[in-house]
């Protein structure tokens, strides 16, 4: 399992919310030799099926990353923007961004006085693409075009940092599972769209797939950095088995079976209670008449920033836990 190469490939693909096609094509190319069926639905979800005679298990990992959409272009060629997903404003200023067509720019803000706070509202931010006039800017970028933080994977040995690690890390787990899994159950792996703006892709896919069990793969925040308010999730101590978050109380039987799977596989895991945020697990739980659902999370520092950081051993542990669970 060369999880680093998988992570690098998926993290470098352009894919803000609503514009996940390039990510999907990268993933499709990686899994095509291990699937019985590959298809796309109307929302752009990539649905990869390995047929089996047992239960139908839906495994969901969202492809989309946070980003920005152009709302207007002023007379001096600066692009006004609106967030796609939950942008951490305090780490956005001065960052490089890229559009799907390759145009690059930098984000800054209206300087109304000398010095001052850098925690500014998004309405005061803009993207500078080097244009001097509105016409010059519109020749490169249109209103409605989306941008993301420019890709840049940092290999720190035992850890990797990158934009889009939320949730390309979860996608990498599903890719590695498909490459090596032995089960009689039917696995429907959904690489979902538009999670960052309301679990939209998973909601549609779950209704279509109609699973017996649902499992989401996603990252979860850590609080193991200096002076952070600590909670139970830290890097390097294994993936988490989620108990609940603000959108989902995980099915107790699914939680129990995940814990048992971790113990059988010899995988260290962490119990997770997340008081804010949600995952595709909530969309699966509420589809049709309801689905027993759970979540396996990968601890991640600096979520929703350009330097989302994971421990490689935690990602590998998530693969091993999930492989044992789906048996």
Language model region names:
Residues 1-327:
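N-terminal hydrophobic/helix-forming segments and targeting peptides
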């Amino acid at each position: 399992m060369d999880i680093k190469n998988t992570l690098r490939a998926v993290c470098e693909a352009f894919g803000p919310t609503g514009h996940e096609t390039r990510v999907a094509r990268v993933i499709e190319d990686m899994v095509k030799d291990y699937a019985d069926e590959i298809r796309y639905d109307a929302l752009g979800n990539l649905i990869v099926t390995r047929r089996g005679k047992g239960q139908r298990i839906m495994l969901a990992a969202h492809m989309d990353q946070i980003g920005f959409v152009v709302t207007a272009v002023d007379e001096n060629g600066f692009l006004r923007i609106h967030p796609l997903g939950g942008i951490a404003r305090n780490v956005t200023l001065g960052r490089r961004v890229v559009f799907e067509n390759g145009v690059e720019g930098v984000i800054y803000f209206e300087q109304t006085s000398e010095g001052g706070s850098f925690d500014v509202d998004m309405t005061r931010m803009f993207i500078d693409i080097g244009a001097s006039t509105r016409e010059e800017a519109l020749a490169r970028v249109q209103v409605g075009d989306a941008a993301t933080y420019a890709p840049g994977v940092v290999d720190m040995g035992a850890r990797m940092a990158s934009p889009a690690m939320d949730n390309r890390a979860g996608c990498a787990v599903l890719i590695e599972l498909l490459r090596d899994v032995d089960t009689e159950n039917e696995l429907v792996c959904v690489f979902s769209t538009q999670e960052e703006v309301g679990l939209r892709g998973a909601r549609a896919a779950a209704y279509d797939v109609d699973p017996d069990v649902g499992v989401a793969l996603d990252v979860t925040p850590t609080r193991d950095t200096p002076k952070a308010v600590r909670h139970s999730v830290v890097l390097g101590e294994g993936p988490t088995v989620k108990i609940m978050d603000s959108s989902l109380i995980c099915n107790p039987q699914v939680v129990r079976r995940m814990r048992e799977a971790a113990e059988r596989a010899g995988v260290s895991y962490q119990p997770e209670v997340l008081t804010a945020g949600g995952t595709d697990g909530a969309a699966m739980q509420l589809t049709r008449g309801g689905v027993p659902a759970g979540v396996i999370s990968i601890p991640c520092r600096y979520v929703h920033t350009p330097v989302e950081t994971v421990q490689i051993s935690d990602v590998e542990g998530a693969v091993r836990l999930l492989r044992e669970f789906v048996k």
